[in-house]
Amino acid sequence: MNIHEYQAKHILSKFGVNVPKGVVVHSLGEVDGALSQLNSKVVVVKAQIHAGGRGKAGGVVVSRTLDETKTSIKNMLGSTLITHQTSKDGQKVRKVYLEEGCNIKKEYYISAIVNRKQGQVSIIFSTEGGVDIEEVAATSPEKVIVCNINPVFGFQGFHGRNLCFDSNLSLDQTRKISDIAGKIYKAVLSTDANQIEINPLVETSSGEFIALDAKINFDDNALYRHPDIQELRDYDEEIKEEIEASKHGLSYIKMDGNIGCMVNGAGLAMATMDIIKYYGAEPANFLDVGGGASQKTVTEAFKIILADDKVNGILVNIFGGIMRCDIIANGIIAAIQEIGINVPLVVRLSGTNFELGKKLLDDSNLNIITANDLSEAAYNIVNIVRK
């Protein structure tokens, strides 16, 4: 689960990380009251969406007068921001964050992530802040320092010193950055976050370190332990199909293509998307119905896929292990009879009782095209949609 910048900063402040003072605004009518709470002539107006790259898209504006601030807010509210992290349709701005400006001396990058490969939390630090850390890692990998924290001992002072050792930082700077690293490490563990990122972490002209931007992503599976964090969820920022899918235990991710996919198993789902791309088309979604799909689950999966207007065809790829293919076939037939499908449908079944499942589909007198293998199925749906 993602949250907004202002929410992330509020959480970080609870762990002792310095953040600029700011106020959330939903309309122009709230501006005067919001500005009265700030003690700076320079105000930064920030669009609040669940995506990075806002600055390059016009979603972060520095204003120095009341008129500039109001103009920036007016231009942002209700607009659609398209960044490298949004879909091509972008995301609508429903709220902005007004924040006190500060005198920036230097920008840094720091984050704490759950490193599943290492089985530890990793702290990542760079003196090159304010830009994508991926770019820095690609062009100047020596400037990205990664420190893995053994969970038995937790974050120690030497971890902070290791982060700053080759960065030509003073003892005071090292001490302050180490302190922040320890705080975000504690925040990750305490909130069950997958990642906490501060970019940029700025050093001001007075030597203070402030989180100028912050992002936090939480582990959905641990949210039941944090009802206060669950309340921060902004459903307006999430894709409605993904929300609906989660209600039915489906793993769904919307994509930009036109061929809908229904598959059981994440690995098989990714392979299905790959082969669709191999034949020259683009998948409209990732959808894993899981190993215990029922008729109701299949029906809901079809509804979610068809809610995307871009879908011109559907490929169902099921491997029957524990789940029998004849049960899946009956579920597909019942789902089609219930909701109707007006786009081409290709189904590939393999595994337990796949012959019976294929016969049920062929004898159903419904507009279902069966395939013997995944390659044939992908080739058929791609070519049918192209016609």
UniProtKB/Swiss-Prot annotation:
InterPro entries linked to this entry: ATP-grasp, ATP-grasp_succ-CoA_synth-type, ATP_grasp_subdomain_1, Succ-CoA_synthase_bsu_CS, SUCC_ACL_C, Succ_CoA_ligase-like_bsu, Succinyl-CoA_synth-like
Annotated Gene Ontology cellular component terms: cytosol; succinate-CoA ligase complex
Binding site for ATP: 46, 53-55, 99, 102, 107
Catalysed reaction, written as an equation: succinate + ATP + CoA = succinyl-CoA + ADP + phosphate; GTP + succinate + CoA = succinyl-CoA + GDP + phosphate
Metabolic or biological pathway, per its Swiss-Prot or TrEMBL entry: Carbohydrate metabolism; tricarboxylic acid cycle; succinate from succinyl-CoA (ligase route): step 1/1
GO terms, biological process: succinyl-CoA metabolic process; tricarboxylic acid cycle
EC number per UniProt: 6.2.1.5
S-S bridge residues: none
Gene3D superfamilies xref list: ATP-grasp fold, A domain, ATP-grasp fold, B domain, Succinyl-CoA synthetase domains
The keyword Magnesium belongs to this UniProt entry's keyword annotation: yes
Every ATP-grasp domain range: 9-244
Keyword Cell division: no
Binding-site positions, substrate: 264, 321-323
Span of the signal peptide: none
Cofactor: how and how many bound: Binds 1 Mg(2+) ion per subunit.
Residues involved in Mg(2+) binding: 199, 213
Keywords: ATP-binding, Ligase, Magnesium, Metal-binding, Nucleotide-binding, Tricarboxylic acid cycle
A GO term, aspect molecular function: ATP binding
Top-level taxon: Bacteria
Functional note: Succinyl-CoA synthetase functions in the citric acid cycle (TCA), coupling the hydrolysis of succinyl-CoA to the synthesis of either ATP or GTP and thus represents the only step of substrate-level phosphorylation in the TCA. The beta subunit provides nucleotide specificity of the enzyme and binds the substrate succinate, while the binding sites for coenzyme A and phosphate are found in the alpha subunit.
Subunit: Heterotetramer of two alpha and two beta subunits.
Protein name: Succinate--CoA ligase [ADP-forming] subunit beta
